[in-house]
A protein has these predicted regions:
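Residues that define the transmembrane beta-barrel architecture of outer-membrane proteins
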Residues: 37-41, 104-108, 156-162, 201-207, ...
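Outer-membrane beta-barrel translocator domains and adjoining extracellular loop/strand segments
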Residues: 10-25, 71-78, 134-143, 195-200, ...
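Short, small-residue-biased leader/transition segments that mark boundaries at the very start
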Residues: 1-6
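Residues on the lipid-exposed face of transmembrane beta-strands in outer-membrane beta-barrel proteins
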Residues: 10, 43-47, 110-114, 124, ...
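Extracellular loop and loop/strand-boundary signature of outer-membrane beta-barrel proteins
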Residues: 25-33, 94-99, 145-155, 193-199, ...
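Predominantly the C-terminal beta-signal and adjacent terminal strand-loop region
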Residues: 31-37, 68-70, 80, 98, ...
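Short loop/turn motifs that connect adjacent beta-strands in outer-membrane beta-barrel proteins
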Residues: 50-57, 119, 171-181, 216-223, ...
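Transmembrane beta-strands of outer-membrane beta-barrel pores
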Residues: 8-14, 49, 63-69, 116, ...
Length: 264
């Protein structure tokens, strides 16, 4: 079995090919397509209150609107005779069936961050994506022709994500280079939103550690080189456990890098 997936500016094409060494067996090709042109709306609010002279607390909430995005998903099944090369094609939805629509879920998030004198920051985020209310087209080979490619209400389940992180900076305005380095660490846990053969998909557990190195010169004192290492564990009881180790490097620019110079 071979699979190929192509995404291009809202166009989605996924091809699955089943071929056999037996020359008397027909090869089977399934081609899933969809075309999406739509919008996504995100809203958020944030409030910061000072707890004391050196301590402050920031809380925030986010909301993403879930709605139908169309797409008109279609399936084309091609059965090819390996000896003669003659192909038989069946396209879904069948004539007389309604066009199907894809959708994105409602998403709700909330979090807080505690800041002690810009030396210690601790934050926690929670995000809920309501995938259980989203339907998805599924092909069933053992169903009647009219029920072979239809919207499935049990394809997904709600996704929960929990994130905890901290940042320590000994002295942000110190003349010492070492004391200006920001040390960061975090963990996250994500529940699966996929239902695989009636069971849960893989759960994700990750941990990361890194630091931000200040870049200092005559005209720039706020740009930071960010380096971090991340371990990600994907685990599902019925499938292979996957462990991934990543190294991330990024650069936060000072806005003065983009200022236009003027000569008077």
């Amino acid at each position: 079995q071979r699979q190929m997936c192509i995404r291009d500016r809202g166009n989605y094409t996924r091809t699955v090919v089943n071929s056999y060494t037996n020359s008397y067996a027909n090869s089977l090709t399934k081609r899933y397509t969809a075309e999406v042109r739509n919008y996504k709306l995100d809203f958020g609010a944030q409030y910061t209150t000072r707890l004391s002279k050196k301590d402050e607390l920031t809380v925030g909430v986010t909301y993403s609107l879930g709605h139908d995005i169309g797409g008109n998903p279609m399936l084309e099944i091609v059965s090819t005779n390996s000896q003669t090369g003659v192909a038989d094609t069946t396209s879904y939805p069948l004539a007389g069936q309604k066009n199907m629509k894809l959708a994105i879920p409602h998403s709700i998030g909330a979090g807080f961050m505690y800041n002690h004198n810009n030396k210690l920051k601790i934050g926690f985020d929670y995000n809920l994506q309501k995938w259980a209310s989203v339907s998805f087209p599924v092909y069933k080979a053992d169903a009647t022709p009219e029920q072979s490619y239809v919207m499935n209400d049990n394809a997904f389940k709600d996704r929960h994500k929990f994130t905890l992180g901290t940042e320590i900076c000994p002295e942000e305005d110190s003349r010492s280079f070492i004391k200006r380095i920001k040390y960061r660490a975090g963990v996250s846990y994500v529940t699966p939103y996929l239902n695989v053969d009636g069971g849960d998909g893989p759960k994700e557990l990750s941990a990361s550690f890194g630091f931000g190195i200040p870049i200092m010169n005559s005209y720039n004192s706020r740009s930071i080189l960010n380096i971090s290492a991340q371990w990600v564990n994907l685990k599902c009881n019925r499938f292979v456990t996957e462990n991934t180790f990543r190294i991330n490097i990024g650069l936060t620019f000072n806005e003065r890098w983009f200022a236009k110079w003027k000569v008077e």
